[in-house]
């Protein structure tokens, strides 16, 4: 206070609080300390290599496949980085990123571009998983028109926005599909469909669970029946060096076979 020639604290018999000048000084001091810490970290990285733990969250579908590919390649460049991965639906993943429980995450559209940085990385069609013996079962797996699904029980993902998205595939707004269940995890949807509870409507990556002919996979024949995936991270939040490096890596290597 003597050096600056201004009061940084308001003092009373029972408490002390920052003045406006004190708040401003604290803000700049925090930025300076952060810069010092990051500079020390940069020097350490140059000497010892990138280290730390990368906290990741992902939806099902293509999320695990994409992350497995990226981490495998990223690890070759930065072998000392460790990983903690968490899986859930998009709403749960969004919440974890918002609360700072993970730095980088994979979700499906729609995306919250006001709160998160969004890097679109992949898309795949939606499909119908139909149990053997069902009238719509097909050994040739040809595409299916959404209206053909109207008379039958459907199982869809649990995310709130999915029901409206799926309703939009049907030509008659007065004829809505029968939603028998909303299921959070693909494996549950697969088992329910295989046992005749309903037709599972999920992104095409659910077909990776199929091991026999007890179900068939038919692509939904509609231009809007696509699932879009994106990498997200929180705006206005300082990322770890590991997270920054990983995001830069994905930007350059987002295409995955």
Language-model features, listed with the residues they occupy:
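Alpha-helical linker/hinge and terminal dimerization helices associated
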Residues: 2-4, 25-47
């Amino acid at each position: 206070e003597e050096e600056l020639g201004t009061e940084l604290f308001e003092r009373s018999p029972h408490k002390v609080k920052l003045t406006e000048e004190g708040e401003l000084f604290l803000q700049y001091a925090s930025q300076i300390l952060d810069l010092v810490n990051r500079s020390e970290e940069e020097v350490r990285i140059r000497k010892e290599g990138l280290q730390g733990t990368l906290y990741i969250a992902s939806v099902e579908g293509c999320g695990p496949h994409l992350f497995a590919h990226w981490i495998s390649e990223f690890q070759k460049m930065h072998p000392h980085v460790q990983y903690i991965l968490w899986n859930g639906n998009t709403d749960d993943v969004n919440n974890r990123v918002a609360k700072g429980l993970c730095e980088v995450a994979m979700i499906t559209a729609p995306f919250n571009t006001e709160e998160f940085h969004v890097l679109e990385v992949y898309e795949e069609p939606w499909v119908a998983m139909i149990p053997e013996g069902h009238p719509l079962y097909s050994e040739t797996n040809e595409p299916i028109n959404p209206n053909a699904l109207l008379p039958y029980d459907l199982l869809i993902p649990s995310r709130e926005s999915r029901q409206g998205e799926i309703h939009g595939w049907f030509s008659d707004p007065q004829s809505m599909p029968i939603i028998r269940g909303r299921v959070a995890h693909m494996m549950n949807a697969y088992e329910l469909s295989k046992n005749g509870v309903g037709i599972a409507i999920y992104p095409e990556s659910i077909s990776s669970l199929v091991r026999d002919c007890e179900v068939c996979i038919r692509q939904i024949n509609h231009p809007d029946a696509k699932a879009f995936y994106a990498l997200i991270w929180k705006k206005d939040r300082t990322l770890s060096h590991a997270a920054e490096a990983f995001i830069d890596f994905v930007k350059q290597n987002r295409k995955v076979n």
